[in-house]
């Protein structure tokens, strides 16, 4: 089951997550959101412990929707290291979602360090100078 989060939870659940995050923006009136949510629920079980899955009601959380340029529903925004790294608009087939998730995990494994926001150096660069 995917946790539904609000603006209050967004920072802790998405931006501070140690795992990559699959954030699915939906609305009750959106007919294509239902099959997307069904597929996302199945993928959440498959990727448990590797990717965090959250659902965000786009109508109730307009500030987040605007900040992350959610212009269509459903919209899926993939986050890594607190940054949006991919955006999928509209209904997505299971194979397309799985491909995006596998790419996200592969990129995570091949990354060479995360940027330190103050000086632009990676954590690896900083450890070399100690």
Enumerate the predicted regions with their spans.
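Thiol-based oxidoreductase modules, predominantly thioredoxin-like and allied folds used
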Residues: 4-6, 25, 40-44, 48-63
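Structural micro-motif
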Residues: 19-21, 68-80
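Short acidic DE-rich linear segments
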Residues: 111-130
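Short active-site neighborhood of thiol/selenol oxidoreductases, capturing the structured segment around
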Residues: 16-28
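N-terminal "domain-start" segment that seeds a small globular fold
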Residues: 1-12
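Conserved redox-active cysteine motifs that mediate thiol-disulfide chemistry
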Residues: 25-39
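Non-catalytic, surface beta->alpha helical segment in thiol-disulfide oxidoreductase systems
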Residues: 77-112
């Amino acid at each position: 089951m995917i946790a539904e989060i609000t603006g209050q939870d967004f920072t802790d659940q998405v931006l501070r997550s140690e795992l990559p995050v699959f954030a699915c923006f939906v609305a009750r009136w959106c007919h294509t959101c239902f099959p997307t949510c069904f597929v996302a629920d199945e993928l959440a079980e498959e990727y448990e412990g590797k990717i965090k899955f959250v659902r965000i009601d786009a109508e109730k959380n307009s500030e987040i929707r605007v900040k992350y340029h959610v212009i269509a529903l459903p919209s899926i925004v993939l986050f890594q290291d607190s940054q949006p790294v991919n955006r999928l608009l509209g209904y997505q087939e299971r194979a397309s979602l799985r491909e995006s998730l596998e790419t996200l995990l592969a990129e995570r494994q091949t990354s060479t360090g995360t940027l330190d926001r103050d000086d632009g150096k990676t954590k690896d660069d900083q450890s070399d100078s100690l």
